[in-house]
Curated annotation (Swiss-Prot):
Disulfide bond annotation, renumbered to this chain: C94-C172
Main localization of the protein described in the UniProt heading: membrane
Modified residues (Phosphoserine): S322
Organism placement in taxonomy: Eukaryota, Metazoa, Chordata, Craniata, Vertebrata
Tissue: Expressed in midpiece of spermatozoon (at protein level). Most abundant in testis and spleen. Highly expressed in CD4 and CD8-positive T-cells as well as CD19-positive B-cells.
Role this protein plays: G protein-coupled receptor (GPCR) that plays a role in diverse physiological processes particularly within the immune and nervous systems. Becomes active when triggered by various endogenous ligands including endocannabinoid N-arachidonyl glycine (NAGly), delta-9-tetrahydrocannabinol or resolvin D2/RvD2 derived from the omega-3 fatty acid docosahexaenoic acid (DHA). Upon RvD2 binding, facilitates the resolution of inflammation, aiding in tissue repair and homeostasis.
Keywords, in A-Z order: Cell membrane, Cytoplasmic vesicle, Disulfide bond, G-protein coupled receptor, Glycoprotein, Membrane, Phosphoprotein, Receptor, Transducer, Transmembrane, Transmembrane helix
Source organism per UniProt: Homo sapiens
Protein's name in the database: N-arachidonyl glycine receptor
Residues exposed to the Cytoplasmic side: 48-56, 117-138, 213-232, 290-331
Entry similarity comment: Belongs to the G-protein coupled receptor 1 family.
Length: 331
């Protein structure tokens, strides 16, 4: 099997993955699927159905939860592929999953950039606070990002095929890790610039201005609760970008510029795991932003504690009854 490197020269293509990687992928994706599915369904329901006063942040959060859910729903197919070492779902569905692997981090970073800009407006430009309630602009921004991202990822369905599609059993190498997404340089260079560097610079610019204003006391008119909430959101976004998205894109850039053999790359696999982890870390954002989401999480925790206490009471009462029965029989 061969594929093409950056100079369009044939190089060996090795699709094998270590057994340790497959086991780790199955365990990791299972945890991500269970946690992420519960968290994001709850968040989408809270933001879309139970939130009375919607703001621009809640609009962005609805889109984050929706994107997370779309990506999470692809994980069972990945797990099946790693468990069975074959792909029975066809070439077209493999291409769709490969495109979604590119689609998720691209749109997620822009949504995080929108949230950062929103917090910039809340802290640095409080006189424009009314704009934060203008959900129409937020909806238009989200629709624009969805269209833009779909437009750039759709060509991945058509431009290149799985180099091992005719093998038996069938494979789907594009969903394995990011090394199989580097074949089209122009498209990937655009992706790296427009869907990583630009939103990253927007976030960094917003954070620097916000920190400068906080240090120089130019936010005295801002309510302490609003300031504290905004700082928490900023710290959460910064940690999420640094941990989940930056290693993934740095590794992707090195792989894209490299000319070596296309084979299993442990750093590519590890950074892909980190990128997938962001679907669960969004729960911190949901918890900070929405009081309704906080209430749902607390109610679930209290309900679990209630069930545990009831089980303990029933166990104790059952033990006391059995002791009384034994005593009566002895008498």
């Amino acid at each position: 099997m061969i594929t093409l490197n950056n100079q369009d020269q044939p190089v060996p293509f090795n699709s094998s993955h270590p057994d340790e990687y497959k086991i780790a992928a199955l365990v990791f994706y299972s945890c991500i699927f269970i946690i992420g599915l519960f968290v994001n369904i709850t968040a989408l329901w809270v933001f879309s159905c139970t939130t009375k006063k919607r703001t621009t942040v809640t609009i962005y959060m609805m889109n984050v939860a929706l994107v997370d859910l779309i990506f999470i729903m692809t994980l069972p197919f990945r797990m099946f592929y790693y468990a069975k070492d074959e792909w029975p779902f066809g070439e077209y569905f493999c291409q769709i999953l490969g495109a979604l692997t590119v689609f998720y981090p691209s749109i997620a970073l822009w949504l995080l950039a929108f949230i950062s800009a929103d917090r910039y407006m809340a802290i640095v430009q409080p006189k424009y606070a009314k704009e934060l309630k203008n959900t129409c602009k937020a909806v238009l921004a989200c629709v624009g990002v969805w269209i833009m991202t779909l437009t750039t990822t759709t060509p991945l369905l058509l431009l290149y095929k799985d180099p091992d599609k005719d093998s038996t059993p069938a494979t789907c190498l594009k969903i394995s890790d990011i090394i199989y997404l580097k074949a089209v340089n122009v498209l990937n260079l655009t992706r790296l610039t427009f869907f990583f560097l630009i939103p990253l610079f927007i976030m960094i610019g917003c954070y620097l201005v916000i920190i400068h204003n906080l240090l120089h006391g130019r936010t005295s008119k801002l309510k302490p609760k609003v300031k504290e909430k905004s700082i928490r959101i900023i710290i959460t976004l910064l940690v999420q970008v640094l941990v989940c998205f930056m290693p993934f894109h740095i590794c992707f850039a090195f792989l894209m510029l490299g000319t070596g053999e296309n084979s299993y790359n442990p750093w590519g696999a590890f950074t892909t795991f980190l990128m997938n982890l962001s679907t669960c870390l969004d729960v911190i954002l949901y918890y900070i932003v929405s009081k309704q989401f906080q209430a749902r999480v607390i109610s679930v925790m209290l309900y679990r504690n209630y069930l545990r206490s009831m089980r303990r009471k029933s166990f104790r009462s059952g033990s006391l009854r059995s002791l009384s029965n034994i005593n009566s029989e002895m008498l």
